């Protein structure tokens, strides 16, 4: 019986010791920081973002012009195909690879 008591006391003592050492480890994190958002770092980040935006502006414009040019090209080809298919010329046919209206007999471009 005394061995059991010793073991229980030892286990209790170890548990209390463990709790005593772990309790001070937890830190208090209830610190509130309020900033206006206008710090030197945020101003520098904003300036860098603006500079990068301006540097890539030319590239964005080129990409947009290219996309618009491709769309215009497809639009003109679509209209030309419609005109070719609705043409009164029975020898006219639409060549999809070259996007042109051609004459079946000569292979030359036909104005629909």
UniProtKB/Swiss-Prot annotation:
Signal peptide coordinates: 1-27
Organism listed in the record: Enterobacter sp. (strain 638)
Keywords, in A-Z order: Signal
Superkingdom in the source lineage: Bacteria
Protein family per UniProt: Belongs to the UPF0482 family.
Coiled coil: none
The protein's name in its UniProt record: UPF0482 protein Ent638_1930
InterPro entries in the record: DUF1283
